[in-house]
Amino acid sequence: VIDSSKSTFIRSNKGEKLYGNLDFYSNLENSDGLSLTLDTNLQFKLFEELKTAISDSKALGGSALIMDSVSGEILAMVSYPSFNPNNSQRVIERNRVIEDFFEPGSLIKPITVAGALKLNLIKKDSVIDTNPGFINLSGFKRSEAGGKNFGKILPSEIISKSSQVGIAKISIKFSSEQMRNNLRLFGFGEYLNINWLNNNNGRMIDAPRLYDIDKASLGYGYSLTSNSLQLARAYSAFANEGVMIEPKLFINDETIRKRVLTKSNASFILDSLRMTILEGTASNLKNEEVEIAGKTGTSEKYIEGVGYASEKYISSFASIFPAQKPKFIMIVSIDEPDPNKYFGGDVSAPVVARMTKFMKRLKYL
C-alpha cells in the first residue's frame, strides 16, 4: 500500500516504510492498493550508499537501482536529491532513474560487440588492431582515454579495457540500419513496457545515413540517450543467457521476456564483463566477497544549447552479480562528480561493492 501522506517514504505491501525521498510513488496510488516489488532493506540501504557516494565525490546528484535479473522485479530504485536545489522555496519531485536521460558512454560497448557477433561482423577470436592508439573517422580524430595504446586486442578486451579505438573499428563494420536496429533490439530508443511510467524513449541520431563517425559514436554510447531502467533491461540479456527481461514495479504484472542473443554470445559478453573486474577498468572490485561482472561508463555531459561541458561528466557502473550465476542487476549513475576523480570505476562502482557485501550479510546472496 502506498502511503499518501507528504512524508518522504512509501510503504511496502508489508506495511513497512520505504525511505528515500520517494513521494514520486504516491502518484501510483489507486483504490485497490498496489503490491510493489520494492524491498524495504535494499531500498533504505541503497539510498544511504548513494548519498554517501554523492557526498564523497562532491557530485550534483545521482541515481541507482537494483533489479532481479530473472523476474525483472525492481527491488530498489532511488535518486538523490529528489528536488531542485536551485529553488529552495519549492520542492520539485524527481526520480532520476526514470527522468534522467544521458549519453551512457562505454556502457554501450558490450551491446555493440554483442551485435557484431550476432551479425557475424566479427568472431570471438577476431584480432582488432588499435595501433597507434587513435583513429581518424570522417575527419575526426578519436583517441584512447589517457593516451593509451592497447595494440592488437580481442573483442573481450575491447570491453574489459574499454577501448575507444577498438569499438570504433567494430562499429564501422555495421551498416547504418544494422547499427540502429541493434540498439533498438536491446531497447534503446524504445519505450519501456511499464504501464505506470510517464514514458520517454530517449533519443538517437536519426540521420538516414550514418557516417563512420556517427556509427562509432553510437558504438561507444554517444549520440543516443538512455535512462537507468533501459540500461538494466539491456544488461538483463547478458545475465539471462540472451533473454532480455522487461523491468516491472508491480508484483502482479506479467514478466515479459524476449530473446535477443544466443546463449553462447551472451555467455561471451558476461565473461568479458567479468574480466572488466578481474583485470580491466573496475579492477578495484576484484577482491570482493561476491564476484561481480560489470562495465564502467564515463561520458562527457551534454547541456542543451551549450554542447559538451568542460569537466562535467556522468559516471556510471552497470553490474551483474553473482557473476557465475546471476541474480541481480545494479545500475549506478553519478551526475557531475569532482572532475579530479570522475571515472565510473572510482565513483559509481564502490556503491555496488558496498551493496553486495550488505546483500551477502543479509542472505540475499
Model-identified regions with their sequence ranges:
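Core domains of carbohydrate- and sulfate-ester-processing enzymes
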Residues: V1-R11
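Conserved, well-ordered alpha-helix/loop/beta-strand core segments that scaffold catalytic motifs
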Residues: Y19-G62
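Short beta-strands and strand-coil junctions in structured, solvent-facing domains, enriched
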Residues: P339-N340
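Beta-lactam-recognizing serine transpeptidase/beta-lactamase-like catalytic domain environment
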Residues: S12-D23, L38, A64-S106, I111-I334, ...
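Short, charged, low-complexity patches
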Residues: D39, Q43, L231, G344-T356
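A helicase ATPase "motif cassette" and its flanking acidic/Ser/Thr-rich regulatory loops
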Residues: L46, I158, V352
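Short, gly/Ser/Thr-rich active-site loops of penicillin-recognizing serine hydrolases
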Residues: R257, A349-L365
